[in-house]
């Protein structure tokens, strides 16, 4: 189905002039953001005109709008009647009953290294130090010296590797924590040295043997113990994950380190609350409509630009010559997408690859082989830049006129600057494809 467009009514009058000025200002701003080559100082867009030739539209399909058209931009204002249409498609955060504790802990972490695990960073609630009773077997446990390495049944007692100049070596396997010691420097806290044999709540295997029947049996206990012995015989620092696993072998919770739900996965760092903002998606309605139509244009649209070209003779940046470029027409053939969702109209073009996927390859290359118009006289060059392959760009053919310097006896001082023309036309194509080709699209309020 073809559509007849009243091109003159749409592009003339105050509304048409305002639209043309907005397009000129938009292209000019885009050129100010482009890194110019060394031989061009600046590029200015002077004017834009729609021309008198109208495009041809042919409707190809009516379907549901693309999913991207339902996403709500954070910068867009939402009316009172549209608030209920916004849906949140992100996972809901888990409720927390300790908001003040979390904020205090996050403030503490901001002043400390972030690579440490939360369980070993000192996030410990105030508590009373338990005093062992006479009936507690832990109270009668013998105190071992850091130099006592003779117990063959305890996998923690291994001699430290010798280092020249440092008595006893540098391995941290010989440092043990005494709960009531409190001497700084000679003992290392449990939070920084894992697998200390005198950690609170950790039973010594050489004294008490296997766990009692009241504790939950762990079938993987003996295999785990053997693997720990094989791993700990090296001189490397023991793994932090093995520390927490060894506490669970005997089924005894640690009274110093608070347990959390993240302890079930000791190798996974705790999740931070820095997830990206949720996507706001509008609710779909039956009246939403999208039109896919083929747009062909071979018209006399005009765009006037001025580029200041630098001359390096007889010295660098000796003089700048204004190069005036006039785009006098172009040939376009592509698939346009117009989606109507309530009070918004979304507009874009499909890339040639996407268009071929939807409708098949184009068997007629009429737009790519149209002849350019006759050249204008008076010392103005007319150059036609066509794509070598039909699908390189939606802009199949761009006709440009170049004029540089002043005229003497009807002739230009410099008749053609091919590099400047090529650069400007490549940027015009790039701006069009980046701003108008899907997934980029424009939204209009109606």
Curated annotation (Swiss-Prot):
Q: Name one GO molecular function term.
A: lipid binding
Q: Where is this region: Disordered?
A: 75-106, 126-145, 188-283
* Acidic residues bias locations: 75-85
Record field: compositional bias (Basic and acidic residues):
126-138, 260-274
Q: Which family does it belong to?
A: Belongs to the MDM12 family.
What does the annotation say about its assembly with partners?
Component of the ER-mitochondria encounter structure (ERMES) or MDM complex, composed of MMM1, MDM10, MDM12 and MDM34. A MMM1 homodimer associates with one molecule of MDM12 on each side in a pairwise head-to-tail manner, and the SMP-LTD domains of MMM1 and MDM12 generate a continuous hydrophobic tunnel for phospholipid trafficking.
This protein's name: Mitochondrial distribution and morphology protein 12
- From which organism does this entry originate? Coccidioides immitis (strain RS)
Name of the gene this protein is made from: MDM12
């Amino acid at each position: 189905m073809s559509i007849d467009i009243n091109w003159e009514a749409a592009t003339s009058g105050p509304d048409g002039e305002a639209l043309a000025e907005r397009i000129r200002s938009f292209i000019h701003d885009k050129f100010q953001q482009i890194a110019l080559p060394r031989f061009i100082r600046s590029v200015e867009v002077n004017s834009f005109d729609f021309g008198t030739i109208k495009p041809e539209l042919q409707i190809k399909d009516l379907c549901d709008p693309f999913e991207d058209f339902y996403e709500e931009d954070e910068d867009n204002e939402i009316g009172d009647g549209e608030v209920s249409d916004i849906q949140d498609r992100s996972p809901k955060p888990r409720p927390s009953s300790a908001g003040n504790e979390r904020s205090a802990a996050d403030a503490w972490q901001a002043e400390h290294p972030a690579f440490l695990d939360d369980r070993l960073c000192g996030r410990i609630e105030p508590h009373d130090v338990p005093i062992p009773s006479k009936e507690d077997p832990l109270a009668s446990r013998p105190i071992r010296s850091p130099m006592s390495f003779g117990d063959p049944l305890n996998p923690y007692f291994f001699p430290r590797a010798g280092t020249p100049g440092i008595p006893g070596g540098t391995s941290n396997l010989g440092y043990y924590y005494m709960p009531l010691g409190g001497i700084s420097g000679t003992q290392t806290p449990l939070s920084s040295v894992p697998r200390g044999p005198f950690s609170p709540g950790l039973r010594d295997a050489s004294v008490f043997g296997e766990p009692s029947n009241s504790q939950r049996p762990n079938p993987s206990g003996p295999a785990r113990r053997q693997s720990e012995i094989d791993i700990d015989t090296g001189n490397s620092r023991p793994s932090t994950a093995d520390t927490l696993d060894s506490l669970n072998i005997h089924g005894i919770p640690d009274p110093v380190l608070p347990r959390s739900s993240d302890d079930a996965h000791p190798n996974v760092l705790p999740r931070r609350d820095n997830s990206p903002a949720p996507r706001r998606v509008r609710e779909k309605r039956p009246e939403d409509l999208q039109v896919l139509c083929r747009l062909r244009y071979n018209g006399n649209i005009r765009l006037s630009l001025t580029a200041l070209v630098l001359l390096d003779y007889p010295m660098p940046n000796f003089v700048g010559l204004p190069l005036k470029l006039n785009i006098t027409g172009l040939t376009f053939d592509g698939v346009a997408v117009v989606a109507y969702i309530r009070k918004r109209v979304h507009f874009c073009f499909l890339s040639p690859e996407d268009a071929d996927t939807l409708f098949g390859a184009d068997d007629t290359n009429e737009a790519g082989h149209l002849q350019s118009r006759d050249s204008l006289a008076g010392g103005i060059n007319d150059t036609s830049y066509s794509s070598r392959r039909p699908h390189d760009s939606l802009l199949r053919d761009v006709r440009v006129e170049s004029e540089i310097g002043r005229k003497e006896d009807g002739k230009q001082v410099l008749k053609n600057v091919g590099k400047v023309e090529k650069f400007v036309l490549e940027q015009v194509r790039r701006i069009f494809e980046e701003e108008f080709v899907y997934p980029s699209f424009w939204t209009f309020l109606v």
